[in-house]
Amino acid sequence: MKSQETLFEIAPAADWNEAYPLGNGRIGAMIFDGTADDVVALSEDTLWAGRPDSEYPVVLKDTLPMLRRLLREGRYTEASDRFWKICGEKPGPGFRDSAVFVTAGNLHIIADDPAARGYTRMLDLRRAVDTCSYTGTCGKVSSTAFCSYPDAVFVKRIRSARARNYRLGFDSPVKGSVSATGNEFFFDGVCPAWARKTETATYETADGLTGIAFRVAVRAIAPGAAVAAADDQLVIDGARDLLLLVAIRSNFKDCDTNPEDSGIDFRALCRADLDAAEARGFDAMLKAHTKDVGALYDRSRLILDAPVSEEGVPTGRLIEGSPGKRFAPTTLIALLYNFGRYLMIASSRPGTRATNLQGIWNNMLTPPWGSNYTLNINAEMNYWPAQTTNLAECLEPFESQIRVFAKQGAVAAEKIYGLPGWCLHHNSDIWGFAGPASGCPWWAYWPVGGGWVCRKIMEHYRFSGDNAYLKQWFPILRGAAEFLSALLVEDDEGKLMTSPSTSPEHGFIDPETGEDCTCCEGSLMDLSIIRELFETCLEAAGILRVGIAGDPLLATLAEQLPRLRKPVIKADGCLSEFGNELPDKDPHHRHVSHLYGVYPAAEFTSLRNPDLFRAAWRSLNVRGDLSTGWAMGWRVILRARFLEGDRAERILHHLLTLVSSGPGGHRGGGVYRNMFDAHPPFQIDGNFGATAAIAEMLLQSHETTDDGRTLVRLFPALPKNWKGGRITGLRARGGLTIDIRWGSDGTRTVTIKADRDGRFHFITPWGERSADLKAGGRLVLRPA
């Protein structure tokens, strides 16, 4: 059904959260499709504040023993207060903190005939093309826009029945200047040398050095029309066919190189991009673009049976009607899945930067939370759908960023802790900042981030079976494990734990003082991440035939692994988030960090440890289903792991609540009219989390049987309300590609293709079956 792969409205975007996103992994464009002032909000993935910097003023190696002693004595309030003073120093240009992602600015396409009748605008996800049409005083007006990965430019073409006049302008909150000449105009900007979250930006360091410089170059091509520069604008008279090409380049090279020393002539690169695009022409670029996107998008699509009444309804209106229904319209469920994959293709391509809190889209100088890499859930959640929904190539930017993290993290580990290996904390940026941020320790101090990001490495191997890849990445795995191994301390019983320890952005109540506290001994998330990393490192070493005898660290990991403190089940039957019977500060907190072992990891499963799995389920029940947008995405996928399809769907229903962009209306978690996830504000991780969750409701492959087979669950959490549908191209660990089809009449067909030899056990609603598949083999499962 077309509505399940299309965003559609009958009015221009009223604000940024109604605009449609286009992207080629590097350039992001938000399309308003206005009639009088048609705004295109532009961004580019290297436009960050800051400069290379390996200074870490917070040094903890001499402070940790004192904090550990206080925690050992149960003096949680005193330990938390002292730690806050250490981490809570207000940052400034001399204080190293994560940098912010910066907008490029807004292209304005101003027409002289704003009147419009019969207005429609549409984002075709399969083609990654925005189209708009209406009738004005000059007759029928239509436009087509896309961001081309093959041609490295943003393209917009506007055609009208009769000639129109236009003015093209540009504005930006970033420091810079606009100039125009011939049929081109340019915005030459410079990112702040320092800026943090929503605070004031500083454009020069104390030494007079500046941030990343960039150019936005716009070329207007209008056959038969007059195009002229007028001050800082282009004026176009008498155009029936206007083609706009936009290139954006910067002088960012890598995390070590000062921008001014990069040797990158970004202005010349812009000109080369525009020249090549103009020479190729609109039709050829559109054809190359749709072929490029289709090769990725068409691998996996979800189509659900839906009433005809949902077809052709504007997306915003469909969302508006959702709260009054018991279940979210199945059209929206399928659209949510397909849109998440679309966003990944648009925001993360080989050779580009990893997606941040807002993907690659931003209209602010200092956006919320800096639109940075938030590593205690959000950055990792961005890539949850990559493997399961068949977009493994889109992981490459995040993998490249892991190398940056590891490089800078080695400096941080030595300077801050005096320890080997590499570390990573809560916030980072394009420069790879790896130290604690300033602020409350329950988010500023979290040294296990390296362990979480490294799970992408082993997951890639489990899906691909690529030994060369694993060998290439093993030193990164080893370095993360080396740091966390050295960070561990013994408790009174000789068990190993982290201390001080936090559980991201959550705290507990000190039983003695009644005060809110931030740090404990051995939070469950810390130990789940460390346990998984040690197991992964040892497993990888075995696959690569790296002997323990030849690597003392591996011997240490093997000795430490069984000594890690085990999860604690509290008297109420829930998992202890903070290591023992410490009461939660907020039982309904948005983070569910103590359930890391359920998802994304596979530490707590019904096969491996049913008691802990049951305690995790009780813990999720206490936390509750309603939360911020991204947090509901995590809850959906947890419910899928607990095989609760109907409850997972109910959370998706709440996730599809329309959030108002302006004053009034719903302000909790949900989606905006353009389907962007609302924390609020917009955070893209909720979109990716929801897409991964929908895939997990239909296919799971994270478990292994006692005899070593990959356990594949089919329809593990299918809601009763999804009467029929089909999904293609899902990926399972072990190298399987799976198509699933089901009908309201009870028919089921599962088609399985194997990339490589493997041993599997399949669990379906109609029975179980083991199978040994050869590379290129095919298996079809259906009820007898």
What are the residue ranges of the model-derived segments?
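Non-membrane alpha-helical structural segments and their capping/turn regions in soluble enzymes
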Residues: 283, 330, 334, 451, ...
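Aromatic-residue-lined binding/catalytic grooves and analogous aromatic/hydrophobic interfacial grooves
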Residues: 1-442, 457-461, 478-481, 495-496, ...
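Charged/polar positions within long, soluble alpha-helices
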Residues: 298, 345, 486-489, 539, ...
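Non-catalytic carbohydrate-binding regions of carbohydrate-active enzymes
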Residues: 459-460, 464, 468-469, 480-490, ...
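Well-ordered alpha-helical segments within folded domains of soluble proteins
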Residues: 377-387, 447-458, 525-535, 593-602, ...
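Short, small-residue-rich loop/turn micro-motifs
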Residues: 428, 449-451, 455-457, 500-502, ...
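Acidic/histidine-rich catalytic neighborhood
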Residues: 479, 483-540
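Inter-repeat boundary and helix-capping residues of tandem alpha-helical solenoids
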Residues: 329, 447-450, 625, 684
